[in-house]
């Protein structure tokens, strides 16, 4: 499996108490994946961590083989990864919800005009913004290389994950023009 097959799900913080618990900073929208016996990968290693206990109320986690404070200190600042395949199995989406990794790299269209592709998703307080890398033909015409489309019904009509396409309203090209 390549790095593209994995997604960041959490960052581990400082130790809490003397028994090996560490603070877990959830980087996903799915806290349900952090439960007893769940396993995660550590970046740039083949090591897997298995949860022995997770306390949701204070976001602390205890991993097998790290059950004392000195051993647990080794985990501070590590990033936990989950395979995309396992994320699909354990994280249930509601209607019209999508995984970030499914949205990234989708082509963005307004009618038959290809505007560009999604390169990042930013969270604002109220909604999400799709960061779009403009299609080369728009850059050649002196439009910006990057622009943002809010993930709101007013701008996004349809997302087709299978075709990796996002269809926007007429206001999307207006955003590109005025960026």
Curated annotation (Swiss-Prot):
It is found in: Cytoplasm. Residues 95-174 form the PRC barrel domain. GO terms for biological process: ribosomal small subunit biogenesis; rRNA processing. It comes from the Bacteria. Coiled coil: none annotated. Keywords: Chaperone, Cytoplasm, Ribosome biogenesis, rRNA processing. Pfam families: PRC, RimM. GO terms for cellular component: cytoplasm; ribosome. Its main location: cytoplasm. The PRC barrel domain binds ribosomal protein uS19. An accessory protein needed during the final step in the assembly of 30S ribosomal subunit, possibly for assembly of the head region. Essential for efficient processing of 16S rRNA. May be needed both before and after RbfA during the maturation of 16S rRNA. It has affinity for free ribosomal 30S subunits but not for 70S ribosomes. This is Ribosome maturation factor RimM.
